[in-house]
């Protein structure tokens, strides 16, 4: 088996996000619909035999030992008892604080890559359980299938939904998830709904009004994109998106936007590009 491996860490969208209530432990009960994008970071792994975990790519403002990639690798080491280590390089394309899963996706890719490189043989459920300790969004990336999520986001039901094209705008802000969920004006009493209701268009993102109020850059991006297509916040933002039936229409709207506004066009996918790549490995 090769001691080197390169794998993608795909972005995700929350196609809706309803907050049903607040639990006694401070976490929020929610419902959301995850779909992956064929766009993301790329990670490169090389196994080492001395047990050291080294991430060679610095992320501004994130200490090495606090990075979810490093925490995922060390967590898997500890839980599995593996004596192997790894060198990791990251090609970072996804924004931090964007609501498209950058850090969680990187952590999930790390767990799956090292399960393969270190020949641990862990099954999907065991990896997802470890991922949940790193963050509520990590299990959806380790499982790799579009899903209707409930609880704090950890109860996942795979779904088969239309794979549309998306134009995603990336306002230059770093949104604090904790700040949004602690806002006193956040809606916390939305009724539970079914996936069919979401696909019929009767849904929203409960975090969007709070994020718009706190982050003018996000509000402006929504106003701009709404001129061309129904726009929505993903997660707690700050990325916003609109859907299109094909790439040509998404590209057409993208070309009409100001040059200074960062954005990308990507296809939605019910099976993540990470898992499609893993299926090709022997």
Curated annotation (Swiss-Prot):
Binding-site residues, ATP: 95-105
Catalyzed reactions: 4-CDP-2-C-methyl-D-erythritol + ATP = 4-CDP-2-C-methyl-D-erythritol 2-phosphate + ADP + H(+)
Organism superkingdom: Bacteria
Gene3D superfamilies: 3.30.230.10, GHMP kinase, C-terminal domain (3.30.70.890)
Pathway assignment: Isoprenoid biosynthesis; isopentenyl diphosphate biosynthesis via DXP pathway; isopentenyl diphosphate from 1-deoxy-D-xylulose 5-phosphate: step 3/6
Enzyme Commission number(s) from the entry: 2.7.1.148
Alphabetical UniProt keywords: ATP-binding, Isoprene biosynthesis, Kinase, Nucleotide-binding, Transferase
InterPro entries for this protein: GHMP_kinase_C_dom, GHMP_kinase_C_sf, GHMP_kinase_N_dom, IspE, Ribosomal_Su5_D2-typ_SF, Ribsml_uS5_D2-typ_fold_subgr
Active site: 12, 137
GO BP of this protein: isopentenyl diphosphate biosynthetic process, methylerythritol 4-phosphate pathway; terpenoid biosynthetic process
Keyword Translocase: no
Name of one Pfam family that matches: GHMP_kinases_C
Entry GO MF terms: 4-(cytidine 5'-diphospho)-2-C-methyl-D-erythritol kinase activity; ATP binding
UniProt family annotation: Belongs to the GHMP kinase family. IspE subfamily.
NCBIfam families for this protein: ispE
Stored PANTHER family: 4-DIPHOSPHOCYTIDYL-2-C-METHYL-D-ERYTHRITOL KINASE, CHLOROPLASTIC
Known role: Catalyzes the phosphorylation of the position 2 hydroxy group of 4-diphosphocytidyl-2C-methyl-D-erythritol.
Record protein name field: 4-diphosphocytidyl-2-C-methyl-D-erythritol kinase
Organism lineage string: Bacteria, Pseudomonadati, Pseudomonadota, Gammaproteobacteria, Pseudomonadales
Gene for this chain: ispE
